[in-house]
Curated annotation (Swiss-Prot):
It comes from the Bacteria. Belongs to the bacterial ribosomal protein bL34 family. GO terms for molecular function: structural constituent of ribosome. The gene is rpmH. GO terms for biological process: translation. This is Large ribosomal subunit protein bL34. The keyword Ribosomal protein applies. One of its GO terms (cellular component) is ribonucleoprotein complex.
């Protein structure tokens, strides 16, 4: 059986990276929430 997690740094960055977050309104809300919470790392 093929495992569900097949790691790829490129796909990770494209789907969950900073620029992907900034591209949508919802993503910007995510970043704002993480900034407000004081997260050291905002995105992948």
């Amino acid at each position: 059986m093929k495992r569900t997690f097949q790691p790829s740094n490129l796909v990770r960055a494209r789907r969950h990276g900073f620029r992907a977050r900034m591209a949508t309104k919802g993503g910007r809300l995510v970043l704002n929430a993480r900034r407000a919470k004081g997260r050291k790392k905002l995105s992948a």
